[in-house]
Amino acid sequence: MYTSEGKKIISTEKAPKAIGPYSQAIRTENLVFTAGQVGLNPATMDLVEGGVEPQTRQVLTNLKHVLESADSGLNFVVKTTVFLKDMGDFPNMNSVYAEFFPENQPARSTVQVAALPKGALVEIDCVALLNPRRGD
């Protein structure tokens, strides 16, 4: 159900619940705007171990679930923003990112930040189109 402002709050148990006063995503008439995801396991709410590669994989899996719950998907992503704690992790993050976006890659910005929630090494948010074949 859409609010009077024309937006729909998106929430799924397949991705980590919000750790602050924000929504996992907001859906408008044609777009989905996700909150930043870090590499939290949604079942435990713990950060996955092993460095930036497994965290990036978990982040993108979380985003996939959020987008799918909004009648979208990774193939409809038009823009991502990647936040890295250390730009030295860029090649490892990038190799995992390429697995999730093998073709028709979205526009992307990548920035280094001083710190991320829960001590994460990577956070990603995105903007996506709705699936034109959705069933609303």
Which residues fall in each region the model found?
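Short, polar/acidic, helix-capping and beta-turn segments at strand->helix junctions
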Residues: 2-136
